[in-house]
C-alpha cells in the first residue's frame, strides 16, 4: 500500500533537519579544534559557536516552517499564511516552497542574498569539508520517494489569519543567554577546568598527561557538536509547539523517527498517537523527551485512522520482542533488539 503524502513529507522533513543539525555540529566541532589545548580562550570560539547555532537554527526554521505549512494543509485543509491579505494558496505552491527549502539544506548553501548568519554557516561548512564528511543520501532518497509517490487530492487550501509563532530566541545574544550554562560546560571554561584537573593528576608524567589531554579535547569536540545539533533541533521542535497550538482542539502526537532510531526513541514510536489537549502536555511531549544527538520530530494529526509505517512497525514488534519480559527487563531486551537492528542497517552482523 502506498504511503500517504503527508507521511512521505514527514520523512523528508526529518532527514532535512538531521542534515542541518549534524552539519551545524560538524562546523562547531571544526571551530573547537582551533582552540589551543593548553590555553583555551573562550572569546573567539564562543562568538563562532554562537553564530553557528544561530545560522543552524535559522536554516532549521526555514525548512520546518515550510514543512508545517504543507503538513497542516494536507492534514486539515487550511494553513497559516506568510503575510496578511491572502485568503488561499495552492498546495503545489506549498510543495514548491518546501522543496526549495529542502534543496538548500541538501546543498548546505543558502545563496548570496540570504541572512548573513546562513551565509556564515554555508561558508564554515565548506571550510570544514562538510560536503565530503556528511552524506546527503538519506535526504535525497526521501525527497525522491516523495516526488515519485502518491499525491493528496487537495488543490487549494484556505489561509487562516495569523502566522506561526516562533520561539523568539534566535539572535546571538539570546542564543548565548539561553544556552550559556551548556556553552560553559562544553566550551573553553569547562575544558580549562578539565585541563587543570589533569595537570594535578598527571603533571609529573608528561606522556600520560599528553594522552589524557588529547582524549579530553576530543571528548569536548563531540560535546560541542552535540550542543549545536541539539540547539538546532530544539528550534524546530518549538515551532511544532506553535503548530500544535494553531491546530487547536485535541491534537494527536506520535514520535517521528529516522530509519534506525535508538531503543528509547523506537520505544516511544511504538506507543503510537497520544491525544493532547493542554499546552503543558504539548510542551512535555514536543520539547522535553529528546536525548543529545536525537533527530526525532513530533508527528501531529487531527485524525488517527492509521499509524505511520515506522510507528506501526515498532508497535507490532514491541510485544514480539518483549514477550515474557516486563518493566525494566522488557526495556532492556527492546534496547538490545533495537541496537541489533541499527548494526544490521550499518553493515554489521
What are the language-model segments listed below?
Residues 1-113, 117-121, 130, 134, ...:
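Non-catalytic accessory regions used for complex assembly or targeting
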Residues 71, 84, 102, 112, ...:
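Prokaryotic Sec-type signal peptides and long signal-anchor helices
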Residues 182-268:
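A broadly conserved sequence feature marking short terminus-proximal activation segments
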